[in-house]
Amino acid sequence: MLEEIKYKLKRKLFRQMEAYDITLDELKEKQMKGAEIIDVRNKREYDESHILGSINVPEYQINESFEKIVPNKNKEIVVYCSSGFRSASAYRRLRCLGYMNVWNLYGGLENY
């Protein structure tokens, strides 16, 4: 247990907030304005808990299925995972697919 706490703390210390990261308050604001909230964790994690109204698209499936789920590349999208690492990767993938209004929930569900 102590090792897990040390590991999580170390990850948080070395993960700096990026320009594409948003806070919990910003997420709530974007959600109220109709942004798509995408949980990029696996289905088991999503089934255990998730942000109300979010859609589950595991990070490893983004390239193959995301354009069918959200065809509008101008739609505002917020991605999240447990801690912010997988969602940061999902953010980069979505940008490569042409989605321009993408944001990452800083710290993921750990901060929710």
Model region roles, listed by residue range:
Residues M1-E48:
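Flexible, polar/low-complexity N-terminal or interdomain linker segments that lie immediately upstream
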Residues D21, I37, S54-N56, V102-N104:
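Conserved beta-strand scaffold positions in the cores of enzyme catalytic domains, especially
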Residues E26, Q61-F66:
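Short acidic active-site motifs
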Residues Q31, H50, F66, Y106:
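Short, flexible helix/strand-to-coil boundary loops that buttress conserved ligand/catalytic motifs
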Residues R44-E45, I55-N56, I62-E64:
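Membrane-proximal soluble helical/coiled-coil segments
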Residues H50-L52, G98:
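Short, structured coil segments at secondary-structure junctions
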Residues E67-Y112:
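Catalytic cysteine-centered active loop of the rhodanese-like fold, especially the PTP/DSP P-loop
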